[in-house]
């Protein structure tokens, strides 16, 4: 336990370094007038787009993560906690630059896993139960999203966001249903209040 907390002191400085790199890169994005497009799987429309809008969200994520790190600075968190914060920070940044449904799906699933581990970090029966419930609701919501993404691909043979134009109404409904439930906007009263009330402040942030 003492060694884990000692490693935690090292990790929290590393996480802070990652946050500063994210903020610096966001400033670089603001200075670049042209967006950057990266094709991962061209035949499937799997790609990333880095523009000023994503730079704004990346800088916001850096500010929030930095606030969490400073809040936890003297709270004796272990290396595992800071590792999950790093994974969560990176996956949230990844979701901001996704330009297709599959890349966004992967990023959101990684966010769900990292969030579950942070919710269950106290390792009490209550926190583990709340974390598992959050993971179940999140994964169920993303199944609707994934079915909608497949319907978009069947129509346009591409997972790119542009495929929403002309996509079946069922695909649009399933995608938005999954995202709204995942984001805690739709039917949030069934699970979100208890998740926030039972989780530690850094995990909720």
What are these regions (language model features)?
Residues 5, 16-28, 58-72, 88-90, ...:
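Central hydrophobic cores of alpha-helical transmembrane segments in multi-pass inner-membrane proteins
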Residues 39-41, 115, 187-197:
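Cytosolic, membrane-interface loops and tails of multi-pass inner-membrane proteins
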Residues 34-92:
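Hydrophobic alpha-helical transmembrane segments in multi-pass integral membrane proteins
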Residues 26-33, 66-76, 97-100, 120, ...:
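Transmembrane helix-loop junctions and nearby membrane-interface residues
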Residues 9-12, 71-81, 123-129, 133, ...:
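Membrane-interface helix-boundary motifs at transmembrane edges
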Residues 9-24, 48, 204:
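Loop-to-helix transition at the N-terminal end of transmembrane alpha-helices
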Residues 83-87, 91-170, 179-184, 201-204:
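Alpha-helical multi-pass transmembrane bundles of energy-transducing inner-membrane proteins
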Residues 1-11:
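Single conserved hydrophobic/aromatic residue that forms the stacking wall/gate
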């Amino acid at each position: 336990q003492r060694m884990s907390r000692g490693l935690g002191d090292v990790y929290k400085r590393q996480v802070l370094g990652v946050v500063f790199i994210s903020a610096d890169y966001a400033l670089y994005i603001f200075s670049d007038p042209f967006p950057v497009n990266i094709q991962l799987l061209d035949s499937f429309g799997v790609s990333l787009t880095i523009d000023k809008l994503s730079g704004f969200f990346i800088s916001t994520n850096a500010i929030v993560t930095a606030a969490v790190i400073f809040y936890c600075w003297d709270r004796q968190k272990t290396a595992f906690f800071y590792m999950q914060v790093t994974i969560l920070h990176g996956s949230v940044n990844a979701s901001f630059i996704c330009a297709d449904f599959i890349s966004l799906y992967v990023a959101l699933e990684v966010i769900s896993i990292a969030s579950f581990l942070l919710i269950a970090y106290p390792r009490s029966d209550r926190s583990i139960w709340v974390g598992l419930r959050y993971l179940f609701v999140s994964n169920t919501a993303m199944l609707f999203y994934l079915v909608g993404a497949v319907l978009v691909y069947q129509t346009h043979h591409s997972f790119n966001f542009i495929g929403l134009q002309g996509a079946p109404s069922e695909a649009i409904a399933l995608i938005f249903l999954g995202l709204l439930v995942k984001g805690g906007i739709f039917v949030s009263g069934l699970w979100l209040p208890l998740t926030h009330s039972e989780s530690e402040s850094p995990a909720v942030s």
